[in-house]
Amino acid sequence: MANKKIDHREEAVELLKQDAKRILQLIKVQMDNLTLPQCPAYEEVLDTQMYGLSREINFATRLGLIEPEEGKKLMSTLEKELSTLHELSMSKK
């Protein structure tokens, strides 16, 4: 095996960022094609995805892979991006 040291911290942060990006993309597709933001199905998908990401962040924090502040920042950034997306969607309709 090569002498390649795996940096689990960087890997954890990158995976969490990818999941946040996936959630943003999922919600964007849903807003563009399927439902209105006031729709219960939309809200349920958003709540479920955000809850899942928060649990992933909590798990990574408990393992010491990310700092609590980094997890809070990731959630806050995603919430701001989703809010902006929501505002843009509402202004188009």
Curated annotation (Swiss-Prot):
Residues annotated as signal peptide: none
Domain of life of the organism encoding this protein: Bacteria
Alphabetical list of SUPFAM superfamilies matching this protein: EF2458-like (SSF140404)
InterPro entries for the chain: UPF0358, UPF0358_sf
Family to which the UniProt record says this protein belongs: Belongs to the UPF0358 family.
Xref: NCBIfam families: PRK13666.1
Protein's UniProt name: UPF0358 protein lmo1070
Source organism of the structure: Listeria monocytogenes serovar 1/2a (strain ATCC BAA-679 / EGD-e)
